[in-house]
Amino acid sequence: MGIKVYKPTTNGRRNMTSLDFAEITTSTPEKSLLVSLKNKAGRNNNGRITVRHQGGGHKRHYRLIDFKRNKDGVEAVVKTIEYDPNRTANIALVHYTDGVKAYIIAPKGLEVGQRIVSGPDADIKVGNALPLANIPVGTVIHNIELKPGKGAELVRAAGASAQVLGQEGKYVLVRLQSGEVRMILGTCRATIGTVGNEQQSLINLGKAGRNRWKGVRPTVRGSVMNPNDHPHGGGEGKAPVGRKAPSTPWGKPALGLKTRNKKAKSDKLIVRRRNEK
């Protein structure tokens, strides 16, 4: 998918880029796989803001994505490549030979008319899903499960990929996009290939309004707030923080504080941290 560059006809258009959607084959989604989405604007069931900077934006339907890929031995044909407003990756509509329709994350190189299949005996081909134990060392994968049968949780964003490094007993060593090397059960499934739409990260929005269309509201700095709104607020002019370390709006340490649970059981499955060289 290429990038479209706009002429600087206005200040908002200067340096603006967008995808040309050349890979998209239809603009009409499969109706049976759509679910309505209510705009919650970052509020919980009490109406209180639990996630800041959310609200507005274009209305969306949620596309039901098959992250489990558990229809073993049943072949599917790729019918369309579609845009999904709920994620950075594109999605593909597949029709199984038993009549079932499903959406999957569209990997790079997947084309309309291509046949894909899931199961331990599937070929090592883009779009096929297999247990990690059946995938050869060095294979590039995405859509990785962490618990067998739960559905893919890792490597689902546009352009993301991971690589199989080896096998240790019932676990498979996988190097993730971040550089972290992690042990994952060999019975967990993954899909062959890299997630498509890899140029999505190169897009320059050009103006704040495009973020608003996506439902993202402005982020206000704490230093320009009043002292009753933020620990950094108040003072005359550009005042310093006035604390030993920067704080969140709720007074907790910000910037650099480790937030991972020190007793996390998954620590023993992480062979190398993402920030280790």
From Swiss-Prot:
HAMAP family linked to this entry: Ribosomal_uL2_B
Subunit structure, as described in the record: Part of the 50S ribosomal subunit. Forms a bridge to the 30S subunit in the 70S ribosome.
CC annotations in GO: large ribosomal subunit
The name this protein goes by in its record: Large ribosomal subunit protein uL2
InterPro entries given in the database record: NA-bd_OB-fold, Rib_uL2_dom2, Ribosomal_uL2, Ribosomal_uL2_bac/org-type, Ribosomal_uL2_C, Ribosomal_uL2_CS, Ribosomal_uL2_dom3, Ribosomal_uL2_RNA-bd_dom
Encoding gene, per UniProt annotation: rplB
Biased composition (Basic and acidic residues): 264-277
Region (Disordered): 222-277
Protein's UniProt keywords contain Magnesium: no
Family listed: Belongs to the universal ribosomal protein uL2 family.
